[in-house]
Amino acid sequence: MVDLSFNATVFMQMFHFLLMLVVLRLFAYRPLMNVIEQRQAYIADEIEAAEKQKAAAAELRSQLEADLAKAREEAKAIVARATKASDEQAQAIMEQARTEAQRLKEEALAEIGREREKAIAQLKDEVASLAVLVAAKVVKDGLTIDAQHNLVQNAIKEVGQLQ
C-alpha cells in the first residue's frame, strides 16, 4: 500500500527548486536573454544594412547603365555629325573642283577662240597679200587662162608651204 504521510523534505525541495528558479532568472536568464536580444538586434541591423546596400547597388547599376546608354547615344551623334560634316566637306570639295574645272575649260576655250581668231586674221592677211601678188602679176603680165591657172596653182603651193 501507499504511504501518504506528510513529509517536510518535499516542501523543502520545492522551496529550493523555486529559489533556484528565481536566482537563475535574476542572474542567468536575464543576462542570457539580453545577449540574445542584442544578437537579434545586431542581425536585424546587418540585414537592413545589406538590403540598403543592395538597393544602393541596384540604383548605382541603373544609373551607370543610363550613363552608358547616354554616352553611346552621344557617341552615335558625334559619329553622325562627323560623317555628315565629312560628306558636306567632300561635296564642297567636289563642287569646288567642278567649278575650277569649268573655269579652266572656259579659259581654255577662250584661249582657243583667241588663237583661232588670231590665226584667221593672219590667214586673211596672207591671203590678201597673195591676192595682191597674184593680181599684180596678172595685171603686169596680162596672162592667159592657162597662165592664170598655173599662177593660182603656184600660189596654193606657196600657201601650203607656209603652213
Swiss-Prot record:
Keywords: ATP synthesis, Cell membrane, CF(0), Hydrogen ion transport, Ion transport, Membrane, Transmembrane, Transmembrane helix, Transport
Membrane topology label: Single-pass membrane protein
InterPro entries (UniProt xref): ATP_synth_B-like_membr_sf (IPR028987), ATP_synth_b/b'su_bac/chlpt (IPR002146), ATP_synth_F0_bsu_bac (IPR005864), ATP_synthase_B_chain (IPR050059)
Compartment(s) of residence: Cell membrane
Task performed by this protein: F(1)F(0) ATP synthase produces ATP from ADP in the presence of a proton or sodium gradient. F-type ATPases consist of two structural domains, F(1) containing the extramembraneous catalytic core and F(0) containing the membrane proton channel, linked together by a central stalk and a peripheral stalk. During catalysis, ATP synthesis in the catalytic domain of F(1) is coupled via a rotary mechanism of the central stalk subunits to proton translocation. Component of the F(0) channel, it forms part of the peripheral stalk, linking F(1) to F(0).
The family this protein is said to belong to: Belongs to the ATPase B chain family.
Name the record gives this protein: ATP synthase subunit b
Lineage: Bacteria, Bacillati, Bacillota, Clostridia, Thermoanaerobacterales
